[in-house]
Swiss-Prot record:
The gene is rplQ. Pfam families: Ribosomal_L17. GO terms for molecular function: structural constituent of ribosome. GO terms for cellular component: cytosolic large ribosomal subunit. Coiled coil: none annotated. It comes from Shewanella denitrificans (strain OS217 / ATCC BAA-1090 / DSM 15013). One of its GO terms (biological process) is translation. HAMAP family: Ribosomal_bL17 (MF_01368). Part of the 50S ribosomal subunit. Contacts protein L32. It comes from the Bacteria. Belongs to the bacterial ribosomal protein bL17 family. This is Large ribosomal subunit protein bL17. Keywords: Ribonucleoprotein, Ribosomal protein.
Amino acid sequence: MRHRKSGRQLNRNSSHRQAMFRNMACSIVRHEIIKTTVAKAKELRRVVEPLITLAKVDSVANRRLAFARTRDAEVVGKLFTELGPRFQERPGGYTRILKCGLRAGDKAPMAYIELVGRPEAAEAVDVEAAE
């Protein structure tokens, strides 16, 4: 029985799932909008939102925690210099999911996940093509 087990399995083992969400979190911090499946987007919120909350208080300890979760120094830098100050007054809800139809190959429901208040010039990055 899977009572009280939160999160989606997404037909992956735990290490694959962890690596996938780490890569997707780095992509959304870097590009501020990505295109992925609806299920992955909903699950990605659970990874990205705590990272941004962590970045609102710039300290060495928080930077080390963020690096441990992302393993990317460039992403940690952007989190603490741009995103943390941008969302300083917002108490949560840093991401938005916009459904965008079905994928051509398998009719999987697709969605854009973006950071709220991102600059309009940012172009969407297709994460599925990168995998």
